[in-house]
């Protein structure tokens, strides 16, 4: 099966190549093995002796792990033996571990006094290791029995969802070594317990689109949901929050500090971790260090914000546009088709003879009458357009939400995603904008003459009568 736009094809098994011979290397304590694997190829790693971890999650002995389309590092505290090609002895893992222990002290204090646990915000430039640090702190927290709430505010990379989303998830169990954060129920069964993410749709890379009004509104709704969860879940309240952010917020652009301030206020942040940017660290120190938090108990407990500077790992590598596009396509493929490992021997840089079991899913295809759907366009006004054409009072923003029933189906809709919201099909545009997401449809084909679209859905049955959001870049219209 092949779908244009996502290159959804099974790799050919016509050619066979001999796998690379395995090589065993002993890693000294406090060192890490850094590796990069292209999409379409795999590398298999087995821990032979000692202990090791990937972003805080321990590797099981004699278990083969398979990686594809990733850039990561395996670290050992006490030394280990595995099959490796490169060993790095300069690593900030001790620094990151100290952050974990400091957060644990705050969590113990929160449990003893009945206060909320630490709320951590991670800032830094693009490709500085922010998400990796989020995984490490989350994995260490779950390892000692904590249940952190993890928030992803970076729309370019989905967490337990597709790209173009902002999510929040409670982690009660370990993180999946091979699949990063793990999998949601929409990705099928998993050896590691699945997570239940709360998902909001934000299909743009820049949080400052439309002066940041749309992004701010979604952040506020996400923060409200997280705060409500902490109020009802004692374990989550004691453990606190870990918030990952997009690297674009660290740039010297007007509105970035205001956006960071909005995030700090909405989530009542107590600790700001700045990775790899002296300039950003100075700005955060000036604006937030030792300032009272925005929590309701801040006045009574004299709770104040701490700003901490962390080193950027030497293992961080730049991810170009082509790689990020491949990441996005891979996440979308995984959402609908599962995560099958390429079956060709030519694709495998095999360091072990054994393999792991991955799940292949079969999405349900159906044809829909486009005009029968309550589809909302998500368009951004260009600088040349007349602002008088928009009604900011309707949405609190200059963005336009137009019901799909009044529009003809557009061929540009092909190979795009539709987000099914929890909002009613008759809800107001503002409610549709702020609604969380139920699931996604992939538009495989468009018949403009008949007004029909063929979509793929992760589950069978009729599409629920809910408002649906799509994104059209105004520069391409």
From Swiss-Prot:
Gene Ontology CC entries for this record: mRNA cleavage factor complex
A Pfam family the protein falls into: CLP1_P
GO molecular function: ATP binding; polynucleotide 5'-hydroxyl-kinase activity
Binding, ATP: 32, 71, 127-132
Any one biological process term the GO annotation gives: mRNA 3'-end processing
Keywords annotated in UniProt: ATP-binding, mRNA processing, Nucleotide-binding, Nucleus
Main location: nucleus
Self-association and partners: Component of a pre-mRNA cleavage factor complex. Interacts directly with PCF11.
Name of the molecule in the record: mRNA cleavage and polyadenylation factor clp1
Taxonomic source organism: Aspergillus niger (strain ATCC MYA-4892 / CBS 513.88 / FGSC A1513)
Lineage: Eukaryota, Fungi, Dikarya, Ascomycota, Pezizomycotina
Gene name tied to this protein: clp1
